[in-house]
């Protein structure tokens, strides 16, 4: 794990994880997409994800949230756009199959070991996600992580998506700790950046060896897998 900023870490009492891309592999739908759309499945899955994120930003910034839609709805709309853009015929059966796959995304293999280690240290664990409550409940249950998460926080409660500051403020509100005593972990660079601006101790899980955003701010730490969470300096000062 790489430390990007020279700061003295405060004790970490809680760790919040982004869900989609961080705990759950959003590109695991590519296998099914390739079965349904031979030769175009990978491209569909990538555009689907990109358009999904674009839609969350769009509805969060337009008319003060007047156009908010639940994440499930935006995910379906993004899938339809990707298929229209790239050409494969998305019939109702294929759409339902892909959406069901998204509801039960594959979890990354290290998730359970990392969460168990954190719980053994007395760390509060949770998810802070754009996903709506029903989506998150299904994903957590499917991955077998329910017993290892103290909180599953959805931005649906405030109808504002990350990267809006109000979305990140849900963490301290629910957990009862200041953001500097909460670590926020995400594989999405835009998410890690906004969480850093908000004041969390941040870890960007750079699974795909990508460059970070060019906006003058780095996350506090960069790693390559979820296991790097266990090396966060603030954990050494946390109660065990």
Predicted stretch roles:
Residues 2-15, 116, 128, 132-133, ...:
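Asp-based, Mg2+/Mn2+-dependent phosphohydrolase catalytic module
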Residues 3-53:
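Active-site neighborhood of HAD-like aspartate-dependent phosphohydrolases
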Residues 29, 44, 94, 145-148:
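Hydrophobic side chains within well-formed alpha-helices
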Residues 31-32, 47, 77-81, 97, ...:
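Alpha-helical elements of Rossmann-like donor-binding domains used by nucleotide-donor carbohydrate transfer enzymes
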Residues 33, 48-52, 75, 98-102, ...:
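Hydrophobic alpha-helical core bundles mediating ligand binding, dimerization, or RNAP-core interactions
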Residues 37-41, 85-90, 144-148, 176-177:
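Short helix-capping segments at alpha-helix termini
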Residues 42, 55-96:
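A metal-dependent, Asp-based hydrolase signature
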Residues 72-73, 90-127, 137, 165:
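Short, acidic loop-to-helix structural element flanking the phosphoryl-transfer center
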């Amino acid at each position: 794990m790489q430390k990007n900023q020279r700061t003295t870490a405060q004790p970490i009492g809680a760790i919040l994880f982004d869900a989609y891309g961080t705990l759950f592999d959003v590109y695991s739908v590519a296998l099914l997409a390739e079965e349904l759309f031979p030769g175009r499945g990978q491209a569909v899955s990538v555009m689907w994800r990109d358009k999904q994120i674009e839609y969350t930003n769009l509805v969060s910034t337009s008319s003060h949230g007047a156009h908010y839609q639940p994440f499930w709805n935006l995910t379906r709309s993004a899938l339809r756009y990707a298929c229209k853009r790239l050409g494969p015929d998305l019939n109702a059966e294929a759409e339902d199959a892909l959406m069901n796959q998204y509801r039960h995304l594959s979890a990354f293999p290290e998730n359970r070991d990392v969460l168990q280690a954190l719980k053994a240290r007395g760390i509060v664990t949770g998810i802070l996600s754009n996903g709506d409550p029903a989506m998150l409940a299904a994903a957590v249950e499917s991955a077998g992580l329910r017993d290892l998460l103290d909180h599953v926080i959805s931005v649906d409660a405030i109808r504002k998506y990350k990267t809006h500051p109000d979305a990140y403020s849900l963490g301290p509100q629910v957990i009862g700790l200041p953001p500097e005593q909460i670590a926020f972990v995400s594989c999405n660079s835009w998410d890690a950046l906004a969480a850093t601006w908000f004041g969390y101790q941040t870890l960007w899980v750079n699974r795909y060896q990508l460059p970070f955003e060019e906006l003058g701010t780095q996350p506090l730490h960069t790693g390559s897998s979820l296991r790097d969470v266990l090396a966060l300096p603030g954990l050494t000062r946390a109660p065990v």
